UniProtKB/Swiss-Prot annotation:
One of its GO terms (molecular function) is DNA binding. Keywords: Activator, DNA-binding, Transcription, Transcription regulation. Activates int gene expression, probably by direct DNA-binding. Int activation requires both rinA and rinB. It comes from Staphylococcus phage phi11 (Bacteriophage phi-11). NCBIfam families: phage_rinA. InterPro entries: RinA (IPR006523). This is Transcriptional activator rinA.
């Protein structure tokens, strides 16, 4: 029997919360991924006397293709756009909650005091955000 929280699997809820916490780092992750793909490590040929077989495709073309087809890049962009849609469609209190709880990583009690809401309201907002994000991403 799998544990459920907010009508979702507990592992799904944890994954969504991890992605929300990681959202402020997405821009840096995309830049790192871009630089990693555009300037890959190329092994040097230490085979002295061996033949060198040149590639028939352009290195730039290969780098761009790898970057555009990157699975990690696609996942990051998918989560980023879903989180941005959630933030844009949220109320002011919900945005403050997301900023303080997920992005600044404060404890729930401290967030409640800072944005002047009750503990129960904070749990309702948290549930609403996670449910909307799961719906946005098509999670069950």
């Amino acid at each position: 029997m799998t544990k459920k929280k907010y009508g979702l699997k507990l592992s799904t809820v944890r994954k969504l919360e991890d992605e929300l916490c990681d959202y402020p780092n997405y821009h840096k992750q995309l830049e790192d991924l871009r630089s990693e793909i555009m300037t890959p490590w190329i092994p040097t040929d230490t085979n002295i006397g061996g033949e060198f077989v040149p590639s028939n495709t352009s290195k730039t073309e290969m780098a761009v293709t790898n970057y555009l087809c990157s699975i990690r890049r696609g996942k990051i962009l998918e989560f980023k756009s879903a989180i941005e849609r959630i933030i844009n469609s949220s109320s002011r209190k919900e945005r403050e909650f997301i900023q303080e709880y997920y992005f600044n990583k404060k404890e729930l009690v401290k967030v409640c005091v800072d944005i002047h809401i009750s503990d129960r309201t904070a749990h309702r907002i948290k549930r609403k955000i996670i449910s909307r994000l799961a719906e946005e991403l098509g999670e069950d």
